Amino acid sequence: PDLERKPYHQRYYLLYGYAEQPQDLHLQEALELLRQLGCDGGSLKQARDGQNVAELIEKSYVPNRQGVHYCDFCGVELTGAESEVLSDGRERCMNCSRTAVKTEAEFRKLYQDAARGMELFYGVRITVPVKIQMVNAKRLHRSLGKTFVPTAKPDGRTLGVAIKRGNDYSILLENGSPRMSSLMTLVHEMTHIWQYLNWDMDAIRRKYGAEMELEVYEGMAKWSEIQYAYLMGETAEAKRAEICTRVRQDEYGRGFVKYLTRYPMSYATHLEGATPFEDKETPL
């Protein structure tokens, strides 16, 4: 057989056998049009991009480093010129400051976005009315029975709480939180409401034991909010949240790690495996 390599103009198909590109073909313009139509962001490219960003942050991001300050909302490392200290001692990066959610109308819109996203991504719906209330930090933490003490490390301060009173459901959210943090908090609390509606709570307690019960609930809620951020294309914030949660020595961190074992994270903008929403009797 003839193994001789053909000339370039005969191998490069867009030249159509000519030595140069035919003048009638406007390839650069066609490429630009395809980009404007979003054709350069297919699922395979998105998966590669998400995986690359996740791997880069996994290698470079180290939470809780001595002498390093972190944004208490998105977890990014701070420099003095790019951050502010809030009245309660929390530190916030400028990006989180610019995207702070300040009105109840914004929160209600965010809740609708979260509800649509959970149905699209996880195939679940919240089938009961949920009252969304914006409160200050003092009232929120009074509801939780907690006191917040700020530190230099990423303080995983609770930004919301889901409350069930009989057949009434509500979510309290702290005002002034950044949009993405607020959205992730909403998904976390909406996951709890979904659990209240779909799980047999007594059966869950019997199956996993009282000592592991909180890990089952909180681990899934953390998995849900972080996976949601990945699916939204917010890979950097999702990965930082994943790393910070993995090292937590509480029901959130321990539960999250257990869920990761059964339900690995999908770094693309589509799910690549099962979710805990699919098994109501044995989620973990």
Residue ranges and their predicted role:
Residues K207-C244:
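Post-HExxH zinc-binding segment in Zn-dependent metallohydrolases
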Residues F107-L110, L183, V187, E213, ...:
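Hydrophobic (often cysteine-bearing) scaffold residues that line and stabilize catalytic clefts
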Residues T103-G166:
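Auxiliary, metal-adjacent structural segments of Zn-dependent hydrolase domains
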Residues P1-Y18, H26-Q112, R116, L120:
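N-terminal low-structure segments adjacent to metalloprotease catalytic domains
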Residues L231-L284:
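Long, well-structured alpha-helical subdomains associated
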Residues S170-L186:
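Short pre-active-site segment immediately N-terminal to the catalytic Zn-binding motif
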Residues E119, G123, Q195, W199, ...:
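Sec-exported extracytoplasmic/periplasmic mature domains
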Residues M118, M184-L197, E218, K222:
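Active-site recognition of the HExxH zinc-binding catalytic motif
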